[in-house]
Amino acid sequence: MTQVTVKELAQEVEAPVERLLQQMREAGLPHTDAGQVVTDNEKQTLLTHLKSSHKSKAEEPRKITLQRKTTSTLRVAGSKSISVEVRKKKVFVQRSPEEIQAEQKRELDERRAAENAARDKVEAEVRQRNEEQARRQAADSAVAAPAPAAKPEPAPAAAPAPVVADAPASEDAAARAAERKKDETRRNESRTRDDDRRRGEAPRVSIKVKVKEKEKAPTPRAAPRTTDEESDGARRGRGGKGKLKKRNQHGFQNPTGPVIRDVTIGETITVSELANQMSVKGAEVVKFMFKMGTPVTINQVLDQETAQLIAEELGHKVTLVSDTALEDSLAESLKFEGQTESRAPVVTVMGHVDHGKTSLLDYIRRAKVAAGEAGGITQHIGAYHVETDRGMVTFLDTPGHAAFTQMRARGAKATDIVILVVAADDGVMPQTREAVQHAKAAGVPLVVAVNKIDKPGADLDRIRNELSVEGVTSEDWGGDTPFVKVSAKMGTGVDELLEAVLLQAEILELTATPTAPGRGVVVESRLDKGRGPVATILVQDGTLRQGDMVLCGSNYGRVRAMLDENGKPVKEAGPSIPVEILGLDGTPEAGDELSVVADEKKAREVALFRQGKYREVKLARAHAGKLENIFETMGQEEKKTLNIVLKTDVRGSLEALQGSLGGLGNDEVQVRVIGGGVGGITESDANLALASNAVLFGFNVRADAGARKIVEQEGLDMRYYNVIYDIIEDVKKALTGMLGSDVRENILGVAEVRDVFRSPKFGAIAGCMVIEGTVYRNRPIRVLRDDVVIFEGELESLRRFKDDASEVRSGMECGIGVKSYNDVKVGDKIEVFEKVQVARTL
């Protein structure tokens, strides 16, 4: 509750402030001012004082009676049953404080008396044991000593004298020892009594025997049998071992307080693992999370902060550990030592689609790549290195289509210089602006190539203006970005462009260590039918050699072969050289870093660790979407979903298509890529599409014989594409068809009521003038009075000059009979309309 002041409390109880302060002083409260704060405890104290002062103290019940009734059924012979009702009654009486104190005092006195009695009993037993021991020693000495007739006295008097003298001293010492070790004495009490009984009885028998047979020498007494906890007697439970059985029981006791445990939490941890570390049931952790407002399951992955909060709330000590220890050890092992040398620049060509990026590269490489690409547009990242008169340059050609945003961002990260290609006749377009943003984010310099300068509509000043808005200012205008006019078709300005690029490279002073182990980045990856996983690698530092063990993201393997961009095998690749490598165990993600490691064991260990981490992150993301939106989606209509199984030729195209298709849809329809991969369409893909009612899409890949057979037998929808535009358009059409249609109303005509007639057949007939549109027979109508709809029905009769008419046009008079409606008045308007179904669009 919130705290209030004395003044606010006086207003609530409707009493003067002075009177309330007087009552608070009488109750012993320290308040003297109306602005002081009154706590809940002080309110309770004041209330108790007021009740006692008015002699209205609430009497608490001193006796509570609980009655419990249990009904059960007892079956008897003959399929009969008897209802048995058991009633129990318990009475709880509240005792006064005086009675409680008296009972506590009585219990304390009884406990002290019991302790004194136990102590006296122990002392008496010790005293008795010492006396018996003294008697036995006297008897033994009397039997062992000779008894001549001349001297009868010394024999009996020699032995007992020291025993009797030592008895009080040993008795006192034993008593003191017993007081110091009460617990040990009580624990060994039964065992000592049994030993004494055996030791006391055996010598008596031997004395009688030895007195009768004085000729025989006395035999030494056998050592008393010990009752060890581990002995067979204790285990088998022979006679007299009742107390020992109790000792042999385990000593576990329930903990009196909460057990605080040390919980070690990594970057992620599942609910079940966290519960195991805290030694509680998983259901308790789930229940605790529900109370915090977060629904979870026992297998859900929690992040480090959430797990730490749960463990600390439950009272345990938390130790946070980093899961990157393995990655850190790998980074330490990858040392780059050696002489640094200058390396060739890595240049990425970016720009809008159809602005001539690949054509410009074709002219530089003296190749014809653009002509061989589907639709004349680039859909992969291409990596090439070119020997020019001024040195070697490595080019990365990126797609310009909007779907390939991730590819362009990846190209900007792996590059040193960006060539921004802008068509002189088209100007700055959306992907041009995006390329500028990627270059700025990566912190790499720009060189603007104004292409298609030979076209009639070329306007260089317009491009400079538009790019200056994006923060790219030409050197001619006082900026730091070179603008070069080129024509990829004619070859104009290409030499000047290369010169500008190499000038930027000299300013950057790019260096590498060729003698170090290779390190690079994955530009693209695909699954080749004959060669397996193939990855395009751009070596950034060191030298990659055939036979090296490489770690690439969550994949690893030994480089079995290396090919350059022309498909020729090479043995090694230095800095800034793009190569294709074979030998990985899977297709790595584009953008993953590649490192040469020392041994296969280390590579496998790190790869498996990364795979597990990726799986945990994926599961956490999936669970977050499922459970957090449970209550939001409750009661809403379920979305219609178009399921797609997508197979592409390279990993980059798969990423681009998944991003583009996932962005389609609205609140009613959505696209879900339930299966995706690199390579041809296999039989398992067809079975997945069959089980999930999905459509099979192949992008630059084909289906094998097994998949085609399943598609034909089951009538699945399978389509092949080689241009990204086509697949996006087809999916849009499919989603539009799933939306259904909207019903739209078109007003056909409006008639105004001028007079009302009565007909024995139709009832009220409205004499109308058509003032707008055309009135049709057997169409739905609305009756409007003062422009407010008062009736909606159907036009039953339409006549003109006593003849039935199918339609009456504007400006003509007619008689209208409304079905099941007779309240037509002069001045009403009759609106005739029709309902039309209209196809919906995204």
From Swiss-Prot:
G2: annotated span: 376-380
Single GO MF descriptor: GTP binding
Keyword Nucleotide-binding part of the UniProt annotation: yes
Composition bias, Low complexity: 139-148, 160-172
CDD domains given in the database record: IF2_eIF5B (cd01887), IF2_mtIF2_II (cd03702), mtIF2_IVc (cd03692)
Region of interest (G4), ranges: 451-454
Ranges annotated as biased composition (Basic and acidic residues): 96-138, 173-202, 226-235
Keywords, comma-separated and alphabetical: Cytoplasm, GTP-binding, Initiation factor, Nucleotide-binding, Protein biosynthesis
Chain segments carrying region G5: 487-489
Pfam families, A to Z: EF-G_D2, GTP_EFTU, IF-2, IF2_assoc, IF2_N
Protein name according to UniProt: Translation initiation factor IF-2
Organism: Pseudomonas putida (strain GB-1)
Organism classification: Bacteria, Pseudomonadati, Pseudomonadota, Gammaproteobacteria, Pseudomonadales
Name of encoding gene: infB
